[in-house]
Design a protein with these regions (language model features):
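Catalytic and substrate-binding clefts that recognize carbohydrates or anionic sugar/phosphate headgroups
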Residues: 1-155, 165-166, 171, 178-183, ...
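Glycine-rich, histidine-containing beta strand-loop boundary motifs that form or position
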Residues: 41, 50, 91, 99-102, ...
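Short, hydrophobic/amphipathic alpha-helical packing segments
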Residues: 64-68, 81-84, 175, 283, ...
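Catalytic core of carbohydrate-active enzymes
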Residues: 75, 374-375, 380-389, 393-396, ...
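Extracellular structured ligand-interaction cores
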Residues: 82-86, 93-95, 103, 126, ...
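Short acidic-glycine loop/turn motifs at beta-strand connectors
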Residues: 89-94, 257-259, 567-568, 669
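N-terminal small/glycine-rich loop or linker at the start of catalytic domains
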Residues: 150-164, 261-274
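Aromatic- and carboxylate-enriched substrate-binding clefts and catalytic-loop regions
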Residues: 187-494, 529-530
Length: 685
């Protein structure tokens, strides 16, 4: 049951699409506070949610902010990252969920100030509060997802491997990447183009020196099974003669200063204007610009810098230079030196800059900081709504850096500029179920780490987690060690682990689609799948992938194994990646086990009475198109038989809900496998 309480005059974020709610006079569970509300926590209560954020799956013990921020240092002392996900579940003495529909800053003090008190502070008393009651956390998630709408569904090729770097500078560098993948028997479906493919960092342009025949090049890549995925940034370069800039100024499509003139900020191109993504006309105009690249054969995009990131504003830059001049003749002591040192560092993402510009919305003129968290959401919405008009029957890949609940209907996310740190492998695992709760099923980290220099063992172990993420993307920053998998010594292991991803695709795609179509979770904490298991409630480094699969990755350097907790008897599957994905199976009882896992191995576990369908192998897997989704091997520990509902479609069109896409597979106690569709062939592994 969902209840709603309105405070003040909320801005309509359009995050909520469901209407099956009941108004409430007084809010249950929560105690009203002058600037929000609080909840007295029991010692055993667990707090789930908040999407992409730092720390663990259980958010208890820290303070978090919903404040979209361009911050590449994802350390434990931070309180916010790129997105705003105001959905949380309390699980314990009482189990309920709540969602705060508000586009500005919200603070979640999850027992930081007072160990036993959850205190939520909303910047203004203009918001909608939803309380969700259910039989379990999974039921609460299901109801919430019905409230906010169906999750984005990408094309099937978007579940293949993606290679990215800031930047592949020209056509030949991209060709070299693809050739090296193919030579080393590593499957690949997409290559990402970062900001240097553009003409001087201008959106919806192509540098004709570096990519002189862009449409032909996109066709050349597609003929090899490779899609190009170019970046689009939020800032539009100020330059006479640049059509996007001139149209935006002429029609009043940019965010403005208080006096109505276009607001100027600094990002990659230097001085830019921000399209007013909250103005419906401006949003439609910006979305229409994606046609420039669609017409050249592009079928996927990533939106970046859309918090929006601000390197500087003209006003803050002017004040900074004045302050530097003031310090020029001073004796810089312990106080003034550090103040001087931080002057330039404080330029970027300065909170004051977000109070300088305005939006023209359906509800009138709004200062940006009051609606800050829905800017990136509406940039991706601009693209999604345009795709519906420009390619109504075709799935287009879209993922974004900044996000807010509601954006999950239009695209996925990658989890931003992480580092090549072992702790970030675990952090990426923690983010998966938290994002799934909020509707963001299509997600993934920068495998290998974006910042810092990576190591071969780190990349291998990260792939051991990443092959289970819907978005499988290796990405790194300029100036760091190149980390394409073919650059390392153990090429056979990298080839095998990527091949394993493609063998698992029938299951991964099936579980993703069922979760999206039925408002469920593709990835969930163990506690959601085993609600009566007290120990499972405490496990933070294992998760369920779909209904059948438990993963427990190795995330510490030099570890050659780890302890794993199995809530029930399961089938262990050990994959020897450097030996053409040779698989060994062992039945393990419930309980704690030390599991050896060598660098070239991946180990996962199949639930008793469940089926894991995988594709048949071979040397021909180069991309998603070469995976046979209709010729399956079934892994199972099913002494009493088992059944599985398998989803398969063409992966391109949008007729998701047709009954014929759902195939029923059974396995009897003697190992005899059947499917109710003649086109899907199955056999026990």
């Amino acid at each position: 049951m969902i209840y709603k309480k309105q405070y003040g005059h909320p801005f309509d974020t359009e995050s909520v699409v469901g209407s099956f709610v009941s108004a409430m006079e007084t809010i249950p569970y929560l105690t009203r506070e002058p600037d929000g509300f609080s909840y007295a926590m029991d010692p055993q209560d667990i707090l789930y949610g908040l999407g992409e954020n730092i720390r663990g799956i259980n958010k208890r013990g820290w303070v978090y902010e919903s404040k979209c921020s361009d911050d590449p240092n994802h350390t434990e002392n931070k309180s916010s990252l790129y997105g705003a996900y105001n959905f949380m579940i309390v699980s314990g003495k009482a189990t309920f969920g709540f969602f705060i529909d508000y586009p500005g800053k919200v603070t979640f003090d999850c027992g930081y100030t007072d160990l036993d008190t959850l205190r939520v502070t909303v910047a203004e008393e203009n918001y909608d509060l939803y309380i969700i009651e259910g039989e379990s956390p999974t039921d609460i998630v299901h109801q919430f997802r019905q409230l906010v709408g169906r999750s984005y569904i990408p094309p099937k090729w978007a579940f293949g491997a993606t290679q990215s770097r800031w930047s592949y500078m020209n056509e030949d560098e991209v060709r070299e990447v693809v050739a090296n993948y193919r030579t080393n028997n590593m499957p690949l479906d997409a290559v990402v183009l970062d900001i240097d493919y553009m003409e001087r960092y201008k959106d919806f342009t192509v540098d004709e020196q570096r990519f002189p025949h862009f449409a032909d090049f996109a066709a050349e890549m597609k003929a090899q099974g490779i899609r190009l995925v170019p970046i689009i940034d939020a800032g539009v370069k100020i330059e006479d003669g640049y059509d996007v800039y001139e149209e935006g100024v002429k029609n009043g499509y940019f965010c403005t200063n208080q006096d109505g003139t276009p607001f100027v900020a600094g990002v990659w191109p230097g001085r830019v204007h921000f399209p007013d993504m909250l103005n419906p006309e401006a949003r439609a105009w910006f979305g229409s610009k994606y046609k420039f690249l669609l017409n050249q054969g592009i079928e996927g995009f990533w939106n970046d810098m859309n918090e929006p990131a601000i390197f500087y504003s003209e006003e803050t830059l002017k004040k900074t230079f004045a302050k530097i001049d003031e310090y020029r003749t001073q004796n810089l002591d312990i106080s003034s030196f550090f103040a001087f040192k931080n002057l330039v560092a404080w330029l970027s993402n300065n909170e004051n800059d977000y109070k300088l510009f305005y939006h023209n919305t359906k509800q009138g003129r709004m200062r940006h900081d009051k609606v800050h968290n829905i800017f990136g959401y509406n940039m991706t919405r601009a693209a999604g709504e345009a795709f519906e008009q420009l390619e109504p029957d075709k799935r287009i890949l879209m993922y974004s850096r900044s996000a807010c609940i509601g954006m999950h209907r239009y695209g996925g996310i990658w989890t931003g500029d992480n580092q090549s740190w072992w702790s970030h492998i675990l952090l990426s695992l923690h983010m998966m179920p938290s994002l799934n709760m909020c509707g963001f099923l299509y997600e993934g980290p920068d495998i290998g780490g974006f910042g810092s220099n990576t190591t071969e063992d780190l990349v291998l172990r990260w792939y051991g987690v990443g092959i289970f993420s819907p978005l499988l993307r290796n990405h790194s920053a300029a100036g760091t060690r190149k980390q394409e998998p073919y650059r390392f010594k153990n090429k056979a292991a990298f080839a095998g682990i990527l091949q394993l991803r493609y063998l698992l695709l029938p299951y991964i795609y099936s579980e993703y689609m069922k979760a999206a179509l039925r408002d469920g979770m593709y990835c969930m904490p163990l506690a959601f799948a085993f609600p009566d298991d007290d120990f499972a409630r405490q496990v933070e480094d294992e998760v369920m992938i779909g209904e059948s699969l438990l993963i427990a990755p190795v995330y510490e350097q030099n570890a050659r194994g780890r302890y794993v907790y199995l809530p029930e008897e399961m089938l262990q599957v050990r994959v020897k990646c450097s030996e053409n994905d040779r698989m060994e199976t062992t039945v393990l009882p419930a309980g704690h086990h030390y599991i050896p896992v060598e660098l070239d191995e991946v180990v996962f576990f199949v639930r008793k009475g469940h089926i894991l369908p995988i594709a048949k192998g071979g040397d021909s897997i180069q991309n998603v198109a070469s995976v046979n989704f209709a010729d399956l091997r079934l892994f199972a520990h099913a002494p009493d038989g088992a059944a599985y509902e398998y989803y398969t479609d063409d992966g391109e069109t949008k007729d998701y809900d047709k009954p014929e896409h759902f195939v029923h597979i059974t396995l009897d106690a003697d190992g005899n496998a059947k499917s109710d569709c003649a086109d899907v062939k199955v056999e026990k592994a």
